[in-house]
Amino acid sequence: EYTCSKELLCKVSEMAHHYRTPVYAHISETEKEVEECKARYGMTPPMFLDSLGMFDYGGGGFHCVHVTDQDLDVFRRHHMYVITNPGSNTKLASGIAPIADYVRHKIPVAIGTDGPASNNCLDMFREMFLVTGLSKLLEKDAASMDAMEVLKMATVNGAKAMRLNRADILAKGKYADLIMIDLHQPNMQPIHN
């Protein structure tokens, strides 16, 4: 919202309706962005974009660091994905996304890296670690973020967020892109699950 005019956003919404397609946007990454949107339109970025019909066909929000309960309602109502980018948000001091809140509210979360201009290390293992670690810090609870849930965010949910329905799980007839990890290496120990 912060880099586009209302007129341009209305055109995006019109196109989304014409093609019946989801819209993905960087949303509520910084407090400044949220405050400026509220000053301009009297609403948070998710509420403003929703008022334009932007998410009538679903989609998602990148970052989603500074959100309200009403924003969560927008995400739920439109079956949107939140794509968290913890490395970028850490580098730019944007804040910590409330991932545990999204999980509690059954809003699907995927993990992204943003881009090289705002993240020096486009490494999904690092991003998974940051999702886990930062969530624990934010929640003040070492058990607040389940490792298997984070793995799902980085794999299944990422594929679903991109509508790669033929590459979301390992199954006959689906596409696969695999890596092998040697769990016997010292840095992989101990294994708890």
Report the location of each language-model feature.
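His/Asp/Glu-enriched, well-ordered alpha-helical/loop segment
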Residues: 51-58, 100-184
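Short glycine-rich, flexible loops that bind phosphorylated cofactors or substrates
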Residues: 69, 90-91, 119, 188
